[in-house]
Amino acid sequence: MNPSLTDTLCTRCGLCCDGSLFADVELVGQAEARRLEIMGLEVDDNESGAGLLSQPCAALQGRRCGIYAHRPKCCRTFECQLLQDAQLGAVTVEAATELIAEALKRIQRVRDLLAQWGAGDVRLPLKERCAEALAGDGGDTRETKRKRAALKAAMSAVESLIWRSFLGSGEQKVAHPRAVGAAQRE
């Protein structure tokens, strides 16, 4: 990992921690889970017994990790496609910064629509919040249909950019054990 690129890009982004890319982070073992619990983070159980750290991460402060030196192994080793492309010189830092800004803008649009509906627990990953809002009983009025269509379109725009620029494919595939999209609780 190139420290100057991570300082430049990752600290402006945070999408891998805020529930936009992933529903949760799979931990490596009980020791890692206990260490995070001692730091005050809630760890959920999973089939492997290692534990899951739900997203959005409670340690995220703005766009930065509040436990950076002690973050889980999965977080230490993950590099999004955009960071990899910047490291290879396939995309300039300026272009990468613009993609991050565009992703944040699209995500904020989804959050604004959810807020207008009064829907979605902010402690849930973005896609789950949308699914809850869309599954809610808002009736069959013209206004409800308009809101649903707007939310679906906004979330589709987010997912398209995320898969293309951050998870490494124009198609929705499993790019991480807990990736948003086809792999996330659908």
Which positions does each model-derived feature cover?
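Hydrophobic scaffolds flanking metal-cofactor catalytic centers in soluble metalloenzymes
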Residues: 1-186
